[in-house]
Amino acid sequence: GGGGGWGWGGGGRGGGGGGGGGWGGGGGGGGGGGGGGGGGLADVSEALAQLRQSPAIAKHKIRFLIATDYREFAAYDIKADDVLECDFTDLYKNYAFFLPLAGYEKSREFSENPADTKAAEKMGRLSDQIRSLNSDSSPEALHALNIFLTRLLFCFFAEDTGIFPPNSFTNALGGITLKNGSDTAAFLAQLFNILNCADHHPARAQAAAHFAAFPYVNGGLFAETYPVPVFDARARRLLLECGKLDWAGINPDIFGSMFQAVIDPVQRSRLGQHYTSVPNIMKAIKPLFLDEFQTAFDQILANSQTRADTKIQKLHALNMRLARIKVFDPACGSGNFLIIAYKELRSLEIRIFQAIKELGRDNIFLSHIHLDQFYGIEIDDFAAETAKLSLWLAEHQMNSAHQLQLGNALPTLPLKDSGHILAANSLRQDWEAFCPRSSRREDEVYIVGNPPFGGSGNRSDAQTEDMETAFAGFKKFKMLDYVACWFWKGAQYIRNSRAKLALVATNSITQGEQVAMLWRPVFALNIHIAFAYQTFPWANNAKHKAAVHVVVIGLAAEPCQESAPDGSQSVFDFGADGGNHELDFSAAKPSPRRLFRPSEQDWVVQEACNISPYLIAGSNLAVESRETPLGKVSPMVYGNKPVDGGHLILSSAEKEALIAAEPQAAKWIKKLLGSDEFLNGKERWCLWLVDLSKDELANLPQTHPQISERIEKVRAARLKSPDKGAQKLAERAHQFRDLHNPESYILVPRVSSERRQYVPMAFLNADVITTDRNQMIPNGTFYEFGILNSLMHNDWMRVVTGRLKSDYNYSGTLVYNTFPWPQASADAQADITELAKNILRARASNSGKTLAELYDPDKMPDNLRQAHQALDAAVDKLYRDKPFSDGLERVEHLFGLYEKLIAAEQHEAENKANAKQGRLKEKA
């Protein structure tokens, strides 16, 4: 066969001889053709399989192998280890498979372990083929298919990890069943039945030897009888290909990504599933409980004054504590958090046993940590079944590690309880009934997980109903993210108890209006934020990675006073040795709370007396929208909303055409700025007919027919609107809804990129109309402009504002009106005014650039950056003489001022109310 990149094998018609010009013939080195016509895809696939064994492939560095009978088509990409199978007539639809021929390599899904990706892709192909052959989509049929796939996954793992004899499942399947797949279902049904039969069950004595050789599995995995789906030749071959993978190299904790690869993408998007990498899982479980257990272990061993037998006693006590805890994931998906938590606890237990052994006690060590300590609720049936399977496999892995390290372990088979995994809607379940506690005061339960996210505009009707159920009794909750439901239910579960919680969430619940809605009622339950990871971009190993920014938040109940039998007050705690300790309540100090802040290299841990709902060091006070500014400054209002159906707005071309047709119209045309036009220098125009007299308006059809036509279209659009306010506006169809047009104003865009250090703002005059995509401060001063352009104000904005995706969504009521303004003398205000003008001068010196370009942090001109830095230093000094180290320190200072200002305002309001009440009493 020739080189050049192609290998060709004939399917039904037989391969050709050796080819030249870059083609390698099936006969000359590809293993020959299929020999005669007919046979369909099974023959083509067989020809391709034979071709892959040819020594000519390596010799000639061939990239693609192809086999076809001109009805069916199969190809193999050697470099990508990828297979294409399709009807010959559909070949053109699959051109992307051959893009490497044009120099475009196909992208590959990232995984830290390539075996995970390959297994996920092959399982996906197998699932697709089975679904195509079995069209029943009833809930019962889908559940049966889900059970079937998890049973296959178990068999693949079992034969590669020592549960079954090596390769026994795949070899039996390949050696006994027919190539056309007609008896594959019957084979699997018989095998699954045997796997559910105990060693002395009569069915084993009657079974064929190749079935009886398989051990009893138990654990419920094969207990129920479900129909096995129909197979054809291709499905059987895909099944065998899956079996030939090395499943020993695949981690059960990657099952989330594998699961994601085989379910419907639309369903995946609807469920909002964001599968979690192991490092991100550890962000939740380490500070939630692992760090405490590891510290206890280290402290026991570190004390050189403690006798060996005392250390052994304390190590046993710690191990017994591990055996008593419960881990509960109320949105467990395919079990990733539970699996990692289980494996980490088992690993710590192994280290405890090794330490006991090294201290001179050579016992027979058997694990006290069992799967029935792990609880999960998952709404998706397949994911729930996968979670059960994954926990069994994780148990087998840890039993093997236990055996390797300590020389003895309980056998994996028969399987034991797979934990408490419930396929149900977590938000409609009673968590207390599902994960019960004998004593809220003593039982350790750790709630952990990554619940689904869903903003107010991205929720299904069912999810909205979930929120109505979860937040029953709340006046406001619809603006909350869907994930907030889990925090609220979790907070109710852990209140007044030893239970703790750590959940991954979209960072929106720590921003904007959501903060007061969610966190005020949570804190009212006497719960605090015990630790938190500030915002970081989400990354996981699943296909089509979800583009979100997340936080990790840990919650715990405040220590509560409880009456002892003698009437004294005490607080309850666990000691380092795992025992229970009563401490004097008055002497108990709150443990420091840990705030994990991102740095260039890693995470920096800051200890704080309290973590605010904005995930900074500070009080629990939530900033709330207000209608007036906290300081004595100019008010901020929305720009002008047109509500015109687009008929009062003109492109540059439309503007020129209108002026050409009706030259007198030029006096009514003004420049129009939304946030995009403002930031990126784009041009739009509008008809601003505010000053039109009644006579001019009446004569428009004769004097300006094009403008009149536009006005009539506005009137029609407003009358058709379901909004009554818009219908009312039809009475003045020639005007925008809002009519703000001051002589001068400061424009503040409502949406700005998170990359910018400063939100770009500008002074504009009455010749420019701003839409409601911007805020405006009519007749704002240069001093106000200077404060707003400082880092002090921008750092405040970054913390308290909401987000549109990850961009800043500037709110006048939530950012501007709540901002604590400094006490500045007239001279200080004059200095800020001059520094603000310097910023405008620096912009003017770079007049060829848009504001988006000027405020790109990578391209900001030096003179503009220096002007801002000079302003920043001056504004900082208005707040205190000592320089601020960073933005967080500024915000912490501002929150302290905000708290004082709000308290003073409330005190003044109370005094006025009391004075009024006093006057009323005097009159009475």
Over which residues does each language-model region extend?
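Non-catalytic DNA-recognition/assembly elements of restriction-modification systems
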Residues: 332, 706-717, 818-924
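Proline-centric
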Residues: 289, 328-330, 377, 490-496, ...
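Short, ligand-facing micro-motifs at secondary-structure edges
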Residues: 534, 753-768, 786, 795-808
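Signature of N6-adenine DNA methyltransferases within the class I
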Residues: 45-50, 59-65, 71-118, 139, ...
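Conserved catalytic cores of phosphodiester-cleaving nucleases, focusing on short active-site segments
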Residues: 1-2, 33-53
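Segments forming glycine/polar-rich beta-alpha architectures that bind adenosine-containing cofactors
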Residues: 238, 624-772, 889-924
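Long, low-complexity Q/N-rich tracts
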Residues: 2-34
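Preference for the N-terminal adenyl/adenosyl cofactor-binding alpha/beta module
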Residues: 88-344, 373, 377-386, 390, ...
